[in-house]
């Protein structure tokens, strides 16, 4: 291309002649790709402080020739069309091959379901005549429905590959609000590149997609850049929060697909650095590893589950106070550095919870690349938040919990369960009831040390606030099996409210025809451990124990085994009772006061039902005393 300052030197006699000849032709620049014209009268001056200072042979500032044009309509012709820059004042520096302008305007038409623009105002701008680029670092995008958006504007003639003029505009920040409908608003940056629209800003702050739900609930999706394509909003790195009162269901990074027409939110936990990272719930106080979350705003049901190999991979649920030596040991690398211990010791020594990864590597006298994988593992497991670009780390409360639990200086729990659903319908979350309904739960571990496991009937479990559970199922603890139990688990008191028990089965002896003792149709409380000793770090000998709250019957035999005379009227009636140390390997010695009924063979006999030498139930009573 041939610009006005490309070939001219001050020392040449024809310097001004050539410049004036070019201006008389009304062309600032001509090239095969673009042309720039102006048709106003020109004032010629010497700028003693040009934008790029010109020096004489003696090193002193010699100023620069400047051509000043006012109220100019600058015509820009390129291969895909043409546009005009209306400007109050334009300063042309032929020696520098640059044009500076103020108060410029360009027609900027962009239409979408999110924003419709018609003009960009350039408070100041520059045109590089060597490449034809227009740049404005102080501009305002004017739309039909919203207030002006502050940002930066650019045009590059060599980036034009469409049949229309491709401008680029990026807002300074993400504080621009757009109302999509009465339930949905977007607080976002604006980035327009040709015919594409996204929400990244120069500041790189997060944009927010906010869904207003009933009863003061809301869903907030945050991303540094949402792609706004037709009726879809997409992002590969979206922070998700479902907020109700002071509680939330949260995930730090998911893939988002939202369709405005169907009004369905689809979130996927399958790709990226944080794939398979848990959802965190402050209401339920659990972590949930799920492949997806689907929700249609306005409805009461959210769905979560497994998409890939759903008949083999489970949804995993753990208490936020869960601790495992296995997980702790897996955080030790081949050099013997346990990254969690190193991180916690570092922040305690420096008395602050944030740092850069290079600070930690320096303290450990190692290369930051060697500990980066461990830092990402901590990030993925919810021990820290981490910015991979800057290396900034912020330590979260889970790190302290694990560190102190490992040292046996803090209580913890072993509360966990899995859900496997071949149909991928693992969790139905009713946001009105504030309950999660699980399918495909084989067992629930409440305490490994106390040998406390619950087996839901048909795999169905209802999760309520603060890890509380409701279900019908069986309980296994030591030599005791509670069969067909309608139960509630209360996490804070760490007990099972056994509302109705079909059968309490107690192993007696393998040498008997029936090696179990049975209690039928009972209820009561099963206390797993002291609420301050969920980890069973302290040895409390009576736990776990069961306290009945209603009478029951012990049938000494069964008519199908011993004949019709031994029917259901041949039994021992027990009032309320208590059984301690359910998890021990041997049965305790029972003494249950009650009444023996013998189908009218004897009058009712008051006695104590005890554990006999063969571990079966019986009583010893001298009848002649009656």
Where are these regions (language model features)?
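Short, small-residue-biased leader/transition segments that mark boundaries at the very start
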Residues: 3-8
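Extended, regular secondary-structure scaffolds
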Residues: 141-144, 148-151, 156, 327-334, ...
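Accessory beta->alpha helical hairpin/"wing" motif in late/C-terminal subdomains of nucleic-acid enzymes
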Residues: 388-408
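Beta-strand-dominated lipid-handling architectures at cellular/organellar boundaries
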Residues: 31-280, 284-312, 409-512, 569-626
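A short, conserved structural fragment
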Residues: 379-390
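Short amphipathic alpha-helical interface segments
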Residues: 329-364
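Short acidic/glycine-rich loops and adjacent helix/strand connectors
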Residues: 323-327, 391-394
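Short amphipathic alpha-helical interaction segments
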Residues: 365-380
């Amino acid at each position: 291309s041939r610009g006005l300052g490309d070939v001219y030197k001050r020392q040449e006699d024809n310097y001004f002649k050539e410049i004036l000849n070019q201006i008389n032709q009304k062309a600032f620049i001509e090239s095969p790709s673009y042309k720039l014209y102006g048709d106003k009268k020109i004032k010629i001056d010497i700028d003693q402080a040009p934008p790029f200072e010109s020096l004489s042979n003696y090193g002193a500032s010699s100023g620069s020739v400047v051509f000043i044009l006012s109220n100019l309509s600058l015509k820009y012709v390129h291969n895909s069309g043409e546009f005009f820059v209306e400007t109050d004042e334009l300063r042309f520096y032929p020696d520098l091959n640059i044009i500076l302008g103020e108060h410029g305007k360009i027609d900027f038409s962009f239409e979408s379901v999110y924003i419709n623009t018609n003009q960009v105002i350039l408070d100041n701008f520059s045109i590089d005549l060597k490449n034809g680029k227009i740049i404005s670092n102080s501009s305002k995008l004017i739309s039909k429905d919203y207030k002006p958006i502050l940002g930066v504007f650019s045009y590059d003639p060599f980036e034009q590959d469409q049949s229309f003029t491709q401008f680029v505009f990026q807002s300074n920040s993400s504080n621009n609000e757009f109302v999509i409908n009465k339930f949905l608003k977007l607080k976002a940056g604006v980035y327009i590149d040709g015919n594409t629209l996204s929400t990244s800003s120069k500041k790189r702050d997060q944009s927010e997609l906010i869904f207003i739900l009933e009863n003061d609930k809301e869903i907030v999706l945050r991303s540094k850049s949402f792609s706004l394509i037709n009726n879809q909003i997409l992002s590969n790195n979206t922070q998700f929060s479902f907020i109700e009162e002071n509680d939330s269901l949260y995930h730090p990074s998911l893939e988002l697909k939202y369709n405005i027409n169907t009004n369905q939110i689809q979130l996927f936990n399958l790709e990226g650095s944080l794939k398979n990272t848990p959802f965190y719930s402050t209401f339920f106080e659990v972590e949930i590893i799920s492949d997806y979350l689907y929700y249609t705003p306005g409805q009461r049901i959210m769905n979560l589950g497994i998409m890939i190999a759903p008949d083999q991979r489970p949804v995993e649920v753990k208490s936020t106070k869960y601790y495992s030596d296995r997980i702790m040991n897996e955080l030790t690398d081949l050099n013997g550095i346990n990254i969690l211990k190193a991180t916690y010791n570092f922040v305690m020594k420096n008395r602050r919870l944030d740092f850069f990864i290079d600070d930690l590597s320096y303290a450990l006298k190692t290369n930051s690349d060697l500990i980066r994988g461990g830092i990402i593992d901590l990030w993925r497991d919810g021990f820290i938040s981490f910015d991979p670009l800057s290396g900034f780390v912020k330590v979260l409360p889970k790190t302290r919990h694990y560190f102190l639990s490992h040292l046996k200086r803090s209580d913890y729990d072993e509360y966990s369960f899995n859900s496997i659903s071949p149909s991928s319908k693992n969790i139905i979350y009713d946001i009105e009831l504030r309950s999660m309904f699980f399918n495909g739960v084989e067992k629930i571990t409440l305490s490994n040390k106390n040998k406390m496991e619950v087996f839901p009937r048909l795999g169905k479990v209802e999760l309520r606030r603060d890890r509380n559970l409701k279900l019908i199922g069986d309980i296994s603890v030591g030599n005791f099996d509670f069969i067909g139990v309608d139960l509630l688990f209360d996490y804070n008191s760490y007990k099972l409210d056994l509302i109705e028990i079909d059968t309490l089965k107690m192993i007696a002896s393998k040498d008997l025809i029936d090696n179990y003792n049975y209690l039928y149709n009972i209820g009561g409380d099963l206390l797993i451990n002291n609420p301050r000793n969920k980890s069973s770090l302290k040895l409390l000998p009576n736990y776990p124990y069961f306290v009945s709250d209603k009478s029951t019957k012990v049938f000494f035999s069964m008519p199908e085994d011993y004949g019709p005379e031994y029917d259901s009227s041949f039994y021992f009636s027990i009032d309320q009772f208590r059984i301690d140390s359910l998890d021990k390997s041997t049965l305790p010695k029972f003494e249950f006061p009650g009444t023996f009924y013998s189908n009218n063979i004897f009058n009712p006999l008051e006695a104590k039902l005890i554990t006999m030498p063969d571990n079966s139930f019986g009583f010893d009573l001298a009848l002649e005393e009656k």
